[in-house]
């Protein structure tokens, strides 16, 4: 039932041996944010990978998700194999109605904390973030993102909801 760390670690190691450049990991797929997102959002979770981590946390009664529980080992593996960690975003807004809400901001702050922790261990990091945001909120959110000393990988079309379910075309 759920994931076993040994299996996840072995899959991560295999990717490293195969020569991948980066791996996306959802350290911020937290049940407290999920609970809040369910209460206030139109689309609570936008990430399939993050959703799987949330499901695992729920069925295994984890206080921290499987990746956060093993962050030190993940950092050591990434450092040893020169693999960049891409901080996945489980709660990026899937609609402009959820843009810059308390869940989005809190996840971004948690990503910032994890980014700094990994960088302090020598790990290279990039950050997935943004999602669907209206033009009037881009500057405010950009100020928060400017606190990262890491590249930002924007996901989702910033100023439009005109192509819902067609991000691959609208971007």
Go through each PLM region and give its residues.
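Alpha/beta enzyme core
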Residues: 1-171
